[in-house]
Amino acid sequence: MSSYGGGYSGGGGGYSNNYDRNGGYSNGYSGSNGYSGGGGGYGSHGSRSYGGGGYGGGYGGGDRGGDRMAGLGSGLQKPNWDLATLPKFEKSFYKEHPNVTARSMAEVEKFRRDHNITVSGRDVPKPVETFDEAGFPRYVMDEVKAQGFPAPTAIQAQGWPMALSGRDVVGIAETGSGKTLTYCLPAIVHINAQPLLAPGDGPIVLVLAPTRELAVQIQQEINKFGKSSRIRNTCIYGGVPKGPQIRDLQRGVEVCIATPGRLIDMLESGKTNLRRVTYLVLDEADRMLDMGFEPQIRKIISQIRPDRQTLMWSATWPKEVRNLAADFLTDFIQVNIGSLDLAANHRITQIVEVISESEKRDRLIKHLEKIMDSRDTQNKCLIFVGTKRVADDITRFLRQDGWPALSIHGDKQQNERDWVLDQFKTGKSPIMVATDVASRGIDVRNITHVINYDYPNNSEDYIHRIGRTGRAGAKGTAITFFTTENAKQARDLVSVLQEAKQHVDPRLLEMARYSGGGGSSRYGGYRGRGGGGYRGGHRSAAHSGANAVPVANRRW
């Protein structure tokens, strides 16, 4: 079997960073958005032209309602795949390094135990312990080493040999574990071994992601590690104009990263096809199912040849994800990093404070004063709230109190969301207020603190929220405000805290014992103060106004 197809021949037309052509951050913003510049690109459009920009209404390109999601893909016809007549393709590239071959199974099992790796399936390859052992081509390894990583992460050590072997793979690992590179680097090798794209061909590699933020981040990784090659890629997601995305697809791209709704829109309108896809990635599969994308995922996969290689990545392994894997993966091998039971990252210090709604603002300020005490610490704080209105209220309150906070939620236009995320990533605005939906897929490294201003609906969302900190081996702190309104969640929260060997507030323990009714009067009644206690605050529909409020008497 040949190794890597004998060098990189490209795909014609040169490498392009299509996201920049879609507008990037360069258009400027105007009016109530509070940004200087303005004119051109997305910033000059009125907010109505984005169809709400949300996850229900945004996928159709901005001018069609959220209920269109229900009918997405109804016009797609399932191809009649005849494997006997389909062109053959190469998908097995792994050649075990002599060092790996020489390791005994006892040594392999010790490595897996030390790194919390468990595997299942037939003939799972041994893990690699160094980048050189993975056997990637020189042009890939040069980019990896340039990033300064000391060694592969656990998911990479086991996942690279699995992906390079051409097998279908399931990977269960927390976000921030390095899984994006686990499938991106083998994707580059896979593309290198395929025939060049012909006019009218669709992509060779398709990556499906739940949100546009995650899709853009995946593209940035592919850009980074494909810099020395000539792989072309594009990012397809809703909430922005279709024109630049259509142009990219029609020019030809080897890699397409997409959210399900916008991709189906492109397929139905004939702007692209999936006939050439031989490497399929489902990233954050559990989140895609949580967000109701299962029908769209099934329709998309029906458009791809059945002998493709499929890699499914998920932070959790619930029944719905298992069913999807059983339906669309063949003889798959599986790698799990850590426990399959839902559990919090043990590197995160969890602090839960039982307080009333009316105490939240003052308590938030006290924590921010400690967190942001020194500019040298480069701390970043992500604040989770329950609604878009509270996100705007909190942001306005913090900015008026001198804190450089910005908010992100589903009603924000895409260009503003990109700008806010960039400000947070770079530390120019080290405090970000977010709702759950807007935060999904956001992968910002070095978040030191998470504050749950409003407690989420369940312990799974709690674990996902606090998992934004403590990534890639770092430590983190999660602070949670818990009120009588959340009493029904007390028992589950206590279980999470005890499993992670965290301190449990005696009041929370007592609440867990009496948590049958939610909001027991023994804790006082703070009912009716939902939305964070902002009785006199802004109550209109969420706009960009909160991010435009001047920061008064900066406290940081």
From Swiss-Prot:
It is an enzyme of class 3 (hydrolase). The keyword Nucleotide-binding applies. It comes from the Eukaryota. Residues 534-556 are annotated as: Disordered. Its main location: cytoplasm. InterPro entries: DEAD/DEAH_box_helicase_dom, Helicase_ATP-bd, Helicase_C-like, P-loop_NTPase, RNA-helicase_DEAD-box_CS, RNA_helicase_DEAD_Q_motif. Residues 347-512 form the Helicase C-terminal domain. The keyword Plastid does not apply. ATP binds at residues 173-180. A motif (Q motif) lies at residues 129-157. It catalyses: ATP + H2O = ADP + phosphate + H(+). Its EC number is 3.6.4.13. Belongs to the DEAD box helicase family. DDX5/DBP2 subfamily. The Q motif is unique to and characteristic of the DEAD box family of RNA helicases and controls ATP binding and hydrolysis. This is ATP-dependent RNA helicase DBP2.
